[in-house]
Each structure stands twice: as structure tokens, then as C-alpha cells.
Curated annotation (Swiss-Prot):
It comes from Arabidopsis thaliana. Disruption phenotype: Early flowering. Involved in FLC activation and flowering time control, but has no transcriptional activation activity. Probably part of the FRI-C complex, but is not redundant with FLX. This is Protein FLX-like 4. The keyword Coiled coil applies. Belongs to the FLX family.
């Protein structure tokens, strides 16, 4: 039951009691009048009835004052509650705006991190191909090493043949020309061998550099994944 309902109920009870008291007084008054016609008794009874009415009026006035005070208190409480409700509504709106901003910031951070991961994954998407190329380079290096050994063996045989030809054809012009030809061939073969050796070393250096880049890219991806996990945990906590 609200304050106003309680106040109205109390007022109604008091009014009913007053009316009941008035009814009883009137009944006693009629009984008194019927029992005696003495003017003195009539005057005393009128004075007593006047006092009763004045007391009733005073009680009702006090009740009205009390009800007015209660109404003023209720009005003040209503105004205070309305102001508190307004302040609470503003705080709720502020909290909602803060939550939306926080969610937007987390979404932007997560999206940026995902884009970085996508770029890094694109850089290492051909990781297996690069590894196969490195393996092929190692195989090529071994092949070149075998060819080098074969070439060295051929050069050695050529030198033996050259010496043999020189010994057999010292007096012949043709032997001299063949010797010059074999020397030129030997120099050419040596030059080719040195060029192939140099090219192979450069290629191996490039492949090693690519391996280092792959390792760095893998570490960067692991770091970015850790950052995404941390950002998601913070979004859930918020």
C-alpha cells in the first residue's frame, strides 16, 4: 500500500470514528432532552456539545495539517526520485557509449592484427616451394662438385696426354700446335669451372638468406597470433 493510500485510509477511519462519536453524542443528547426539560440541564448540554464540536474541528484541522505535511514530503520525495532517475539514466547512457567505443576499438585492433597475419601468411605461403628450391640447390651443388671432380680428372688426363704428345712430337710443328690447343682448352675449362663455382656459391648464399627470412617470418606470425589472443581476451573481459 502506498503512502497516499495509507494516509487516505487513516483519514477515513478517523472521520468514521468522529461520525460515530457524533452519532452517539446526538443519541445521548436526545435521551437527555427527552428525560428532562430543565433549562439548566439544557444549557449545560449545549455547552458540552459545543466543546465536542470544537474538539472535532481541532482534530480534523490537525489531521489536515498532517496530511498536508505528508503530501509535501511525498512531493519532495517524488522530485528527488525523479532527479535521481535522470542522473542514473545519464550514467547509463554514458556507460553504453563507453562500451560501444571500447567494442569498436577492440574490433579495429583485432581486424588490424588479422590483416597483418594475412600478409605474413601470404609471404610464407610458398614456404614448401622455397624449401624444395633449397633442396634442389643442395642437389645442384653436389652435382657441380661431382662435375668438378670429373673435370679435374679430365684435366689431369689431358695433362698426361699433353705430356705424352709433347714427348712424342717434340720435333714436329703439328705437335706444337696441338700443345697450344690443349693449353687453351685447359684454360677454357678451368675458367668455366671457376665461373660455375662462383655462381654456385652466390646461389647458395641467396638460398641461405631466403631460409633466414622464412624463419623470421614464422617468428613474426607466432608473435602476431599471441597479440590476437591477448586482444580477444581483453574484449571478453571488457
Amino acid at each position: 500500500m502506498s503512502s497516499r493510500e495509507r494516509i487516505g485510509s487513516n483519514h477515513h477511519s478517523r472521520v468514521s470514528q468522529g461520525m460515530s462519536t457524533s452519532g452517539s453524542s446526538s443519541s445521548r443528547h436526545h435521551d437527555t432532552i427527552s428525560s428532562t426539560s430543565d433549562p439548566r440541564h439544557l444549557r449545560d448540554h449545549q455547552i458540552s456539545l459545543s466543546d465536542i464540536l470544537e474538539n472535532k474541528i481541532a482534530v480534523q484541522a490537525a489531521e489536515i495539517d498532517r496530511l498536508s505535511n505528508d503530501n509535501r514530503k511525498l512531493a519532495s520525495s517524488y522530485v528527488a526520485l525523479k532527479e535521481d532517475l535522470t542522473v542514473a539514466d545519464r550514467e547509463v547512457q554514458g556507460l553504453r557509449a563507453h562500451i560501444r567505443k571500447t567494442e569498436t576499438d577492440h574490433e579495429i585492433q583485432i581486424r588490424s592484427t588479422l590483416e597483418k597475419i594475412a600478409k605474413m601468411e601470404g609471404m610464407v605461403k610458398n614456404r614448401e616451394n622455397i624449401r624444395r628450391e633449397v633442396q634442389s640447390a643442395h642437389i645442384e651443388a653436389h652435382r657441380l662438385a661431382r662435375e668438378r671432380e670429373e673435370l679435374a680428372s679430365k684435366v689431369k688426363l689431358g695433362m698426361k696426354d699433353l705430356k705424352k704428345v709433347c714427348l712424342e712430337a717434340e720435333s714436329l710443328e703439328a705437335s706444337s700446335q696441338e700443345l697450344e690447343r690443349l693449353k687453351e682448352e685447359h684454360q677454357r675449362l678451368r675458367k668455366e669451372f671457376e665461373e660455375e663455382k662462383s655462381g654456385n656459391v652466390e646461389k647458395l648464399a641467396q638460398l641461405k638468406g631466403m631460409e633466414r627470412k622464412i624463419i623470421g617470418a614464422v617468428k613474426a606470425i607466432e608473435k602476431l597470433r599471441s597479440e590476437i589472443s591477448t586482444a580477444r581476451n581483453k574484449a571478453v573481459e571488457n
